[in-house]
Amino acid sequence: MVASDDPRLARKVRRLGRLDMPGGGQVVVEGDYAYVGHLNPPYGTSIIDVSEPRKPRIVSRVMLDGEDTHTHKVRVIGDLMFTNYEMYNRYYFRRGDNIHEYTAKLEGELGRPPSDAELAHALTEDLYVGGKKKVLTEADIPILRAARERGYHDGGFKIYDISDKTEPKLIKHQRTHAWGSHRFDVDENYIYVSTEWEGYVGNILVIYDIADPARPAYVSHWALPGQHIAGGETPTWNADDNRVHHGMRHGDQIWVGALWGGFYVVDVSDITQPR
């Protein structure tokens, strides 16, 4: 957070208060409270009393176990708080999925098992983390091997009871697939989740009924043309470069942002058959 009163930073805007806290990915404000989804574990979600803007105060925090997950998106509907649950540093750890493939490829080229340094060089191709080129070293290879063996099984979203803002209570951890949910929209009836899904490449849009928050029920899903590889489709892009980033519902439409691919307007007048 910027802690400067330099008038050149903004026009007709002045800072009333500030908090020194870990960085956030999404901030939403409902009534007297702000909800911050933090970017980096172990910090999950903070609930902040902003009834006195000059004196904001943290009333509770949801902390995460371990370093495998981040929950940087948050939304609130009434007394329910929703957060994503997504594999942290996923582009980096995903390279571990390719270790066996690259080991076999290099062994064929070299006529011997590759060293960790050679594997790191091969796996570095087209690897970007946080928008920056990531160069792997031989020290990364044991980490990636361990992550591959460990796997990731927690991806999805969580629903909390926040009727008492000082003590959020977990209602449900809904697992989706693979690295889990990135961003989402939600209303009183449904949650619209961007998540990986069995049989598809990259994130697609998946809709759940949340009438009973303790038992979210799958309703339907929608994907970009070319994502359904299990159904015989072939993407025209590399890996998961194009995918559903998130959708926002407006009336009977969901406006879906496609990463590096523009946007789509999806008709959900029949929620069971998005088109």
Can you annotate each of these PLM segments?
Residues 1-275:
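Feature marking well-ordered beta-strand scaffolds used for ligand recognition
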